[in-house]
């Protein structure tokens, strides 16, 4: 097993104003997430979220970050959520094993001492997209079947943003310390996500772009302040960090899906500030 965790520091809008393309990608993009047999994580100082991919093949994988986090075990002071976007797999939580079908997920409580990920078929491995945030108390762990998610149709064909938002971890349906997580699927023939744009000063957010409608699909993701936007081109299964001051929207050459995850001081989903189209630069 290879384990890799990189650190991305927090930056002010004035800092990123001077970044060239390579610098912007280095500071906000996670390019390699699902590597067979590996764990690939990013620790962003934006609200101290840890996110990335766990891709077990022949051997189960466990995230161990006690030394890096100054704790006795990974989730001693953290909670964790994941969504499986690969083949069938299992997760063993403190000795209890559960099946995890494609597109199913899990919320795992602070205080959980062992989380072991495995694939049912090594030739078609599970791809666990994991997100962990700081926690102050333990809430019950919960298995999250895709069929039970809260589905929200959004947008329309005329604006090329017809999509369905599937809420997995949401304050309206379950208790967490701060983690929110979901999966958005664009309908065929649609390309824009989160447009009109918004910001939410009390939360940061990561996007994992996945399930592209065509192998050659690419997504241009926009971030930065509304009056000074930047863009990053993403390939399948790449993720981007959006600071709390930043817009976060994208447009693809065909349809696609993405997993969003948020954390911060406010869990109200609608706590956001809309950006007028005339203000975008």
From Swiss-Prot:
Associated pathway: Glycan metabolism; pectin degradation; 2-dehydro-3-deoxy-D-gluconate from pectin: step 4/5
Catalytic reaction list: 5-dehydro-4-deoxy-D-glucuronate = 3-deoxy-D-glycero-2,5-hexodiulosonate
Cofactor binding annotation: Binds 1 zinc ion per subunit.
Pfam families to which the protein is assigned, alphabetical: KduI (PF04962)
SUPFAM superfamilies tied to this protein: RmlC-like cupins (SSF51182)
Alphabetically ordered keywords of this record: Isomerase, Metal-binding, Zinc
Entry EC number(s): 5.3.1.17
Superkingdom in the source lineage: Bacteria
NCBIfam families given in the database record: PRK00924.1
Record's protein name: 4-deoxy-L-threo-5-hexosulose-uronate ketol-isomerase
């Amino acid at each position: 097993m290879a384990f890799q965790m990189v650190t991305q520091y927090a930056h002010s809008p004035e800092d990123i104003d001077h970044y060239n393309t390579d610098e912007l990608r280095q500071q906000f993009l996670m390019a390699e997430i699902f590597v067979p047999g590996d764990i690939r994580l990013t620790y962003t100082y934006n609200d101290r979220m840890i996110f990335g991919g766990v891709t077990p093949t022949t051997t189960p994988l466990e995230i161990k970050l006690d030394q890096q986090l100054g704790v006795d075990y990974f989730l001693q002071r953290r909670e964790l959520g994941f969504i499986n976007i690969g083949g069938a797999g299992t997760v063993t939580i403190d000795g209890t094993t559960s099946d995890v079908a494609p597109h199913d997920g899990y919320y795992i409580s602070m205080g959980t001492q062992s989380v072991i990920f495995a694939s049912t078929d090594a030739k078609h491995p599970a791809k666990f997209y994991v997100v962990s945030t700081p926690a102050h108390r333990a809430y019950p762990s919960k298995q999250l079947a895709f069929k039970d998610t809260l589905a929200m149709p959004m947008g329309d064909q005329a604006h090329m943003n017809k999509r369905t938002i599937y809420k997995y971890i949401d304050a309206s349906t379950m208790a967490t310390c701060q983690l929110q997580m979901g999966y958005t699927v664009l309908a065929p023939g649609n390309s824009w996500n989160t447009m009109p744009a918004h910001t939410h000063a009390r939360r940061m957010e990561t996007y994992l772009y996945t399930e592209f409608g065509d192998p050659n699909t690419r997504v241009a993701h926009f971030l930065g302040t509304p009056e000074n936007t930047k863009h990053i081109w993403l390939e399948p299964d790449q993720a981007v960090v959006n600071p709390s001051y930043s817009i976060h929207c994208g447009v693809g050459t065909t349809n696609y899906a993405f997993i969003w995850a948020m954390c911060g001081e406010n869990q109200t989903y609608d706590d956001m500030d809309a950006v007028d189209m005339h203000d975008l630069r």
